[in-house]
Amino acid sequence: MGLSWQQLLILLLVVVVIFGTKKLRNIGSDLGGAVKDFKKAMNDDQPKDAEFKKISEEVEQTSVENSKQKEQA
């Protein structure tokens, strides 16, 4: 019950007539830029390997020190 290719073609022609090719091109480039920025932001949120290793080593060292202190007490 979807749209046939003829109906999609007519719909595309109507959209081009209403908005014009220049405005559609601008909308496409704006949408592409937004998607690119979103992907970049998602990748920036992931911790860097070096930072992650450093933090995990600090946590491990602190855990060992705490264990030694508990054993001595």
UniProtKB/Swiss-Prot annotation:
User: What InterPro entries does this protein's entry cite?
Assistant: TatA/B/E, TatA/E
Please state the span of the N-terminal signal peptide per the UniProt entry.
Answer: none
Q: Where in the cell is it found?
A: Cell inner membrane
Its GO CC terms are: TAT protein transport complex
Q: Which GO terms describe its molecular function?
A: protein transmembrane transporter activity
Pfam families referenced in this protein's UniProt entry, alphabetically: TatA_B_E (PF02416)
Family assignment? Belongs to the TatA/E family.
Q: What is this protein called?
A: Sec-independent protein translocase protein TatA
What species was this sequence derived from?
A: Histophilus somni (strain 2336)
